[in-house]
Design a protein with these regions (language model features):
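N-terminal secretory signal peptides
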Residues: 1-7, 14-26
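Terminal leader/tail segments of proteins
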Residues: 2, 32-36, 46-208
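General helical structural elements
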Residues: 9-14, 31, 204
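Bacterial Sec-dependent signal peptides at the C-terminal "C-region" and cleavage site
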Residues: 26-32
């Protein structure tokens, strides 16, 4: 006796999909004739994004500060933070001689000790840091840099040749009075030798 021919696998899959749709109260839509092709409409031009609001801590720390640029730091594809550069005058070179502020708005949770150790590593790339400086700066940054989470804002204000002042979400954390620390710390983002040249270009408003 001949057995009935087994329906093709493609039919079985179609029947299974139809049954699943029916169980969910849905019906497959019949195919519609293709609409006549029309010339593609060019996409609308997206207006430039408005500048971010001035962080409250800069009102007294950096009078007349203006937003200069914003850049995004990613690591292995992960969004780490958005960086903003603020100053009263346009920033030139590495900005070491100018009062300015860097604002980091974090996009994920990070441990303060990790932020401190990474900062020291980047600073050591830009200039000679001896053992005494390394130990002192790491200790200070570990105390100044808290654990952060998505949305936290960490602000560093540069007082050229004098000190760096730190704020978390507008609250003063403390300062490190050390001209060389200040130069190398802000050099992480603004030195021509930064490890993130694209981010530097974005912060400077497209100028290198």
């Amino acid at each position: 006796m001949k057995l009935p021919r087994r329906p093709p696998r493609r039919w079985l899959l179609q029947l299974g999909a139809a049954a699943a749709l029916a169980a969910a109260g849905l019906r497959p839509v019949a195919a519609q004739p293709a609409a006549p092709t029309t010339p593609a409409t060019p996409p609308a031009t997206t207006p430039a994004s408005p500048p971010p609001a001035t962080p409250p801590e800069l009102t007294s720390e950096l009078p007349g500060a203006r937003w200069r640029g914003t850049g995004v730091l990613r690591f292995l594809g992960l969004h780490i933070y958005d960086a903003q550069l603020w100053s009263a005058q346009a920033v030139s070179g590495d900005g070491a001689a100018q009062p300015l502020a860097l604002v980091l708005v974090y996009a994920r949770q990070l441990v303060g000790e990790q932020i401190a150790s990474r900062s020291l590593k980047e600073m050591s790339r830009l200039g000679r840091v001896d053992d005494e400086q390394s130990a002192r700066w790491l200790k200070a940054m570990t105390q100044l840099f808290p654990d952060v989470r998505d949305g936290d804002r960490l602000t560093g204000v540069q007082r050229p040749g004098v000190a760096t002042r730190f704020f978390l979400n507008g609250q003063f954390r403390g300062e490190l009075v050390d001209a060389e620390f200040t130069r190398l710390f802000f050099g992480i983002w603004l030195s021509p030798r930064t490890s993130e040249p694209r981010l530097r270009e974005q912060l400077l408003g497209g100028r290198s």
